A protein has these predicted regions:
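Phosphate- and other anionic-substrate recognition elements at nucleic-acid/protein interfaces
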Residues: 2-6, 10-125
Length: 125
């Protein structure tokens, strides 16, 4: 099965992929608006033939934005699952530092967060 992990943001969306048991950071989507985020993500999902989409759900106000994003993807008939993303950004930054990532490469933190979200899902499915 082909999986896509998503760390949703209103400016940047981190993406990670997996075709088995190991999630890998993939790319960052730059978005201008909520509708732009839904459109760009939907295109990637369809073009990539992903069978399962895993979206991290944070607490608080951003959680409401993520819920709206998930709802918009659901309305397009996409197979979306929501998982807790508590500490995913912190873990992602820790992994990047341990791997010696430069400040320039740390701009990919959202993709690493998406990989943490997806890996947690894969480990617990």
């Amino acid at each position: 099965m082909k999986y896509l992990g998503i760390d949703f943001g209103l400016r940047r969306i981190g993406l990670a992929i997996s075709e088995g048991d190991l999630a890998s950071p993939w790319q960052i989507l730059e978005v201008k608006s909520f509708s732009d985020a839904v459109e760009k993500t939907s295109i990637i999902i369809k073009e990539g033939h992903f069978q399962k989409i895993v979206v991290g759900l944070p607490e608080g106000k951003m959680g409401q934005n993520v819920a709206g994003f998930v709802n918009a993807l659901d309305k397009r008939g996409l197979n979306v699952e929501v998982v807790d993303e508590t500490l995913s950004s912190k873990k992602a930054l820790q992994v990047m530092i341990e791997q010696g990532a430069s400040q320039k490469k740390r701009r990919f933190e959202d993709a690493y967060s998406a990989a943490e979200i997806l890996q947690n899902y894969l480990d617990n499915k």
